[in-house]
């Protein structure tokens, strides 16, 4: 595979990624000619991050927020080259893919493993979780599989409604109504004034749906 589009906006970085970048720059200044053991370096960064106060982390969190805003702004104006037109900017309001049974299992046991073995790397933690899952009896896996199936079913309904109407919560109002809304929108696309009115209505709908979710 070749390199991606060089004009594509650089991906957004997390607060921890900014912290690691800063650590790397500090290390280079102190030891410009020394080679870096990535595994050992990552471990030290992780340990240092855990001991930092919320105030100390705040600087990096602000950097991450600013970078996220930059990324979203650039992606709105980014036009992918031919052949990549299907790769659209990921809508933050789109329904999130449901976790697998194994992922749910990991979410529950990862904190326990980290607590018992604080020195383990991310890779080692993942390996240990994989071994635990493989050694778990089918009956014990069942609750995770059942929950994952329910989440998958909900996701399929939400994504169908989202694709029809363009809103993640449209399933509450039904897919049929969502399709009517889409048709209405297409008919009004040529009339700018009506299109503006429709956008205002959509915003009101979203606010109402968010209120429903909060209840």
Swiss-Prot record:
Disulfide bonds: 23-45
Cysteine sulfonic acid (-SO3H), modified sites: 23, 45, 106
Keyword list, A-Z: Acetylation, Adaptive immunity, ADP-ribosylation, Autophagy, Cell membrane, Chemotaxis, Chromosome, Cytoplasm, Disulfide bond, DNA damage, DNA recombination, DNA repair, DNA-binding, Endosome, Immunity, Inflammatory response, Innate immunity, Isopeptide bond, Membrane, Nucleus, Oxidation, Phosphoprotein, Repeat, Secreted
One example of a Gene Ontology biological process annotation: chemotaxis
Annotated SUPFAM superfamilies: HMG-box (SSF47095)
Positions bearing Phosphothreonine: 51
Record-listed Phosphoserine modification sites: 35, 100
Post-translational modification N6-acetyllysine, affected residues: 3, 7-8, 12, 28-30, 43, 90, 127-128, 141, 172-173, 177, 180, 182-185
Biased composition (Acidic residues): 187-215
Post-translational modification: Phosphorylated at serine residues. Phosphorylation in both NLS regions is required for cytoplasmic translocation followed by secretion. Phosphorylation at Thr-51 within the NLS is crucial for secretion induced by porcine reproductive and respiratory syndrome virus (PRRSV).
Protein location: Nucleus; Chromosome; Cytoplasm; Secreted
Ranges where the record places region Sufficient for interaction with HAVCR2: 1-97
Keyword Transmembrane found: no
Region (Disordered): 76-95, 162-215
Region ranges (Binding to AGER/RAGE): 150-183
Covalent crosslink: Isoglutamyl lysine isopeptide (Lys-Gln) (interchain with Q-?): 28, 43-44, 68, 180, 182-184
UniProt xrefs under PROSITE patterns: HMG_BOX_1, HMG_BOX_2
Listed Pfam families: HMG_box (PF00505), HMG_box_2 (PF09011)
Site description Cleavage, residues in chain: 10-11, 67-68
Binding site for heparin: 1-10
Family assignment from sequence similarity: Belongs to the HMGB family.
Protein's job: Multifunctional redox sensitive protein with various roles in different cellular compartments. In the nucleus is one of the major chromatin-associated non-histone proteins and acts as a DNA chaperone involved in replication, transcription, chromatin remodeling, V(D)J recombination, DNA repair and genome stability. Proposed to be an universal biosensor for nucleic acids. Promotes host inflammatory response to sterile and infectious signals and is involved in the coordination and integration of innate and adaptive immune responses.
Protein name from the UniProt record: High mobility group protein B1
Species for this entry: Sus scrofa (Pig)
């Amino acid at each position: 595979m070749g390199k991606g589009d060089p004009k594509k906006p650089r991906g957004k970085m997390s607060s921890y990624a900014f912290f690691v970048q800063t650590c790397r720059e500090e290390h280079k200044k102190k030891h410009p000619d020394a080679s870096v053991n990535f595994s050992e370096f990552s471990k030290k960064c992780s340990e240092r991050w855990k001991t930092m106060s919320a105030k100390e982390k705040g600087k990096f969190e602000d950097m991450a927020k600013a970078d996220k805003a930059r990324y979203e702004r650039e992606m709105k104006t980014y036009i992918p080259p031919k052949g990549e037109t299907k790769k659209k900017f990921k809508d933050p309001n789109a329904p999130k893919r449901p976790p697998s049974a194994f992922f749910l299992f990991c979410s529950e046991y990862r904190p326990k493993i980290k607590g018992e073995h604080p020195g383990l790397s991310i890779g080692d933690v993942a390996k240990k979780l994989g071994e635990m899952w493989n050694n778990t009896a089918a009956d014990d896996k069942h609750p995770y599989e059942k929950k994952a199936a329910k989440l998958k079913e909900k996701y399929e309904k939400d994504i169908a409604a989202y694709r029809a109407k363009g809103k993640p919560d449209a399933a509450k109002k039904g897919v049929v109504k969502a399709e009517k809304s889409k048709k209405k929108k297409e008919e009004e696309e040529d009339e700018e004034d009506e299109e503006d009115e429709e956008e205002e209505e959509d915003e009101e709908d979203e606010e109402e749906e968010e209120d429903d979710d909060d209840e």
